């Protein structure tokens, strides 16, 4: 794919299983979203979890039970087919990965779209801040931390973060740029000290791929929407569906419409 393709065109390819890889760098001008789909019985408590933990779980859209089209963020899209790779969970255990969840989706399911840090990557690169996972053609590095989120009903989780190595002299620029995107996790939660988050080895992420951290660079950590997936697993619902880490839903929402002045 090229960066010139529209979100609609990319989603069409994804729906045909022509793209099943991570979405970092795709449609760089448009916001991407984490996906959580679960039974309506759990929807309010999960919504409350997101509200209480808005840094890792900023809400872009919530679909009514049984609705498959995200009318606000991607009219005409289908939440059942337009994610490159889904994970299907039964009682907290991974049952399968799939590129189409039409057979699992029923009229009682509520879909949540939550902000993603891929949204601000184009602004970083546009300002001369390198994004290593894009440079190396990898998924972003994600780590489970020692910080606990506020619980809600059966939902609880440790905070998950992404890490991007930033040249030392560009760290403040990266902080300023990303702080404008509160619906894409906003400013970093930690700069330069993985140990403070309980991260022992940057070369061993819990999700995604390891990336190169060069001399003269600082590891910078942002809250991550995979936190929401861990929260859902903690509740052990009979069935829930999430995106596979790094395989996001691409919306029609321009990044800049999510940015503060």
UniProtKB/Swiss-Prot annotation:
The keyword Cell inner membrane does not apply. Keywords: Lyase. Its EC number is 4.2.1.-. InterPro entries: D-Glu_cyclase, Putative_hydro-lyase, UPF0317. GO terms for molecular function: lyase activity. SUPFAM superfamilies: PSTPO5379-like. It comes from the Bacteria. Transmembrane segments: none annotated. The keyword Lyase applies. Pfam families: D-Glu_cyclase. PANTHER family: D-GLUTAMATE CYCLASE, MITOCHONDRIAL. Belongs to the D-glutamate cyclase family. HAMAP family: Hydro_lyase. NCBIfam families: PRK05463.1. This is Putative hydro-lyase Sfum_3393. It comes from Syntrophobacter fumaroxidans (strain DSM 10017 / MPOB).
């Amino acid at each position: 794919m090229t960066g010139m393709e529209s979100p609609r065109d990319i989603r069409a390819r994804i729906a045909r299983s022509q793209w099943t890889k991570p979405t970092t760098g795709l449609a760089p001008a448009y916001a991407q979203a984490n996906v959580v789909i679960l039974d309506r019985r759990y929807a309010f408590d999960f919504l409350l979890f997101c509200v209480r933990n808005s840094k890792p779980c900023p809400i872009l859209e919530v679909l009514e039970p049984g609705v498959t089209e995200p009318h606000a963020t991607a009219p005409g899209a289908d939440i059942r087919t337009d994610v490159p790779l889904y994970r299907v969970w039964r009682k907290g255990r991974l049952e399968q990965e799939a590129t189409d969840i039409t057979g699992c989706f029923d009229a009682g399911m509520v879909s949540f779209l939550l902000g993603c840090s891929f949204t601000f990557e184009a602004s970083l690169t546009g300002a001369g801040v390198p994004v290593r996972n894009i440079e190396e053609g990898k998924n972003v590095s994600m780590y489970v931390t020692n910080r606990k989120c506020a619980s809600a009903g059966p939902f609880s989780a440790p905070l998950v973060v992404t890490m991007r190595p930033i040249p030392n002299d560009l760290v403040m620029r990266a902080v300023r740029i990303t702080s404008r995107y509160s619906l894409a996790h906003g400013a970093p939660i930690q700069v330069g000290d993985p140990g403070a988050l309980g991260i022992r080895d940057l070369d061993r992420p819990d999700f995604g791929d390891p990336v190169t951290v060069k001399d003269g660079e600082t590891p910078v950590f942002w809250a991550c929407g995979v936190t929401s997936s861990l929260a859902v697993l903690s509740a052990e619902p009979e069935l829930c569906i999430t995106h596979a880490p790094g395989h996001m839903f691409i919306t029609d929402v321009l990044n800049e419409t999510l940015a503060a002045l």
